[in-house]
């Protein structure tokens, strides 16, 4: 079973004025495979901090987070990320951006192209593979980011303010 487990996560920041800010305080949860967790709250309440810890962009002050019974301590293809602004490489084509998600694996070039084409069709971008990403609308760019995330069939999908 794929579980995401947070145990006593704490994140403390120091402001430029030297003040202490507790962005996360003793956060505990278990998310089972197939479940969806939506974190809601006002600006500055720690939503993105929790996401950044889960994606291992930052380390918590204390506590741990586990996926499939393994502590998350570095990047891995078992997690997929869709950023608020897509975070696409504008100088690459749509297909090259989607393929970027597969670069962490050793894949046959023919199989890779087949997978990219399949995902472009799934997200409604069939025929756009050779289009530079910067020429797409915001919604189309979001679909490219989604295809890039899902092409590896991650166990966990992280989305920061999806549209």
What do the PLM-derived regions correspond to, one by one?
Residues 40-42:
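The feature captures the beta-strand-to-loop junction immediately N-terminal to the Walker
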Residues 63-74:
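Conserved ABC transporter NBD signature motif
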Residues 92-99:
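Short coil-to-helix segment of the ABC ATPase nucleotide-binding domain corresponding to the Q-loop/switch region
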Residues 146:
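Hydrophobic anchor residue at the start of the ABC signature
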Residues 157-160:
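Catalytic Walker B motif of ABC-type/P-loop ATPase nucleotide-binding domains
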């Amino acid at each position: 079973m794929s579980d995401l487990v947070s145990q006593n996560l704490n994140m403390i920041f120091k402001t430029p004025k030297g003040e202490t800010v507790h962005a996360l305080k003793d956060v505990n949860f278990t998310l089972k495979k197939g479940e969806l967790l939506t974190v809601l709250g006002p600006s500055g309440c720690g939503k993105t901090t929790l996401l950044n810890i889960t994606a291992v962009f930052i380390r918590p002050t204390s506590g741990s987070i586990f996926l499939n019974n393994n502590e998350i301590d570095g990047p891995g293809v078992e997690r997929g990320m869709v950023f608020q602004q897509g975070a696409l490489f504008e100088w690459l084509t749509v297909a090259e951006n989607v393929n970027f998600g597969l670069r962490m694996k050793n894949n046959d070039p023919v199989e890779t192209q087949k997978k990219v084409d399949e995902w472009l069709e799934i997200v409604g971008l069939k025929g756009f593979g050779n289009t530079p990403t910067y020429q797409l609308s915001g919604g189309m760019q979001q679909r490219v980011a989604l295809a890039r995330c899902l092409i590896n069939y991650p166990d966990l999908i992280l989305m920061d303010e999806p549209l």
